[in-house]
């Protein structure tokens, strides 16, 4: 019987690539989303992957959504915490609401999603948790104090939880992408991309979502059973100093 993998933010961008790659690797995949219903339906029609709508910022919604997934597909063996948002602003202009929304989704969302699956993974003596952090959680980024703080928190969460899960057969790892060729990045002004961003990357190109997805598939696999508490940078050579 195929293992069940749940991917948050799993119907768009990096998450969609992860969902597709896990399905191709033989997993039964559930893709969580919180936004556009039409886009989610189109994703399901294209891939055959079931989608489930709830906000990772809401603990009760996460618990209910996870219960539904497990009732329909089986126990969750792989959890990919990918959902994330940005509310960028220089700190002197950042509002409490902008801070709270990012922390609630990008950091507290990891607790909200992982806590309901943790006991089951412990009971079954098996689990794979992959947290999608960011290179900006390691180096920081002006205009993203909220995002950088949340993504740095994801790394601390990963390392602490890995220690708790190690003897229960649960691995917990993080991936820190740099600039990835998603719709969001492609929408950046071309001059900013070509003059400000691309020159910072030694290979002079961003990564594609599928490249991050392949990292996730590896960390979810049996081959990665001895890897836990690790942070995997994927910035195409950028930020070597981190």
From Swiss-Prot:
A Gene Ontology molecular function term for this protein is: acetoacetyl-CoA reductase activity
A Pfam match is adh_short
Tell me the domain of life: Bacteria
Signal peptide bounds: none
In which pathway is this protein known to take part?
Answer: Biopolymer metabolism; poly-(R)-3-hydroxybutanoate biosynthesis
Offer one example of a GO biological process linked to this entry: monocarboxylic acid metabolic process
E.C. no: 1.1.1.36
Gene Ontology, cellular component aspect: cytoplasm
The record's section on SMART domains has: PKS_KR (SM00822)
Q: Which CDD domains match?
A: BKR_SDR_c
Task: Give the enzyme class.
Answer: oxidoreductase
Residues at which NADP(+) binds? 12-14, 82-86, 177-180
Catalytic residues? 147 (proton acceptor)
Localization recorded for this chain is: Cytoplasm
Q: Does the keyword Cytoplasm apply?
A: yes
Catalytic function, reaction form: a (3R)-3-hydroxyacyl-CoA + NADP(+) = a 3-oxoacyl-CoA + NADPH + H(+)
Residues recorded as binding substrate, renumbered to this chain, are 88, 141-144, 178-179
Q: Cross-referenced PROSITE patterns, in alphabetical order?
A: ADH_SHORT (PS00061)
Q: Which UniProt keywords apply?
A: Cytoplasm, NAD, NADP, Oxidoreductase, PHB biosynthesis
User: InterPro entries under this entry?
Assistant: Acetoacetyl-CoA_reductase, NAD(P)-bd_dom_sf, Sc_DH/Rdtase_CS, SDR, SDR_fam
PANTHER family recorded for this chain? 3-OXOACYL-(ACYL-CARRIER-PROTEIN) REDUCTASE (PTHR42879), 3-OXOACYL-[ACYL-CARRIER-PROTEIN] REDUCTASE FABG (PTHR42879:SF2)
Q: What does the similarity note say?
A: Belongs to the short-chain dehydrogenases/reductases (SDR) family.
Extra information: NADH was preferred to NADPH as a substrate.
Task: Report the protein name in the record.
Answer: Acetoacetyl-CoA reductase
Annotated organism of origin:
Paracoccus denitrificans
């Amino acid at each position: 019987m195929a293992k069940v993998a749940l991917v948050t933010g799993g119907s768009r961008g990096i998450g969609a690539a992860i969902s597709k790659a896990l399905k191709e690797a033989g997993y039964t995949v559930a893709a969580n989303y919180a936004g556009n219903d039409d886009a989610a339906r189109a994703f399901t029609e294209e891939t055959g992957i079931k989608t489930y709508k709830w906000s990772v910022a809401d603990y009760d919604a996460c618990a209910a959504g996870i219960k539904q997934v497990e009732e329909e597909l089986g126990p969750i063996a792989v959890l990919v915490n990918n959902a994330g948002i940005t509310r960028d602003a220089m700190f002197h202009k950042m509002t409490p609401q902008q801070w709270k929304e990012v922390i609630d989704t990008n950091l507290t969302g990891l607790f909200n999603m992982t806590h309901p699956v943790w006991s089951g993974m412990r009971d079954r003596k098996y689990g794979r948790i992959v947290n999608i952090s960011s290179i900006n959680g390691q180096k920081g980024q002006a205009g993203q104090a909220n995002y950088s703080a949340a993504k740095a928190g994801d790394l601390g969460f990963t390392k602490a939880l890995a220690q708790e899960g190690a003897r229960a057969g649960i691995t917990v790892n993080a991936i820190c992408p740099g600039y990835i060729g998603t719709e969001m990045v492609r929408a950046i002004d071309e001059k900013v991309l070509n003059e400000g961003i691309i020159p910072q990357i030694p290979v002079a190109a961003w990564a594609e979502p599928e490249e991050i997805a392949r990292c996730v598939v590896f960390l979810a696999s049996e081959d990665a059973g001895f890897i836990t508490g690790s942070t995997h940078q994927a910035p195409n050579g950028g930020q070597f100093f981190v």
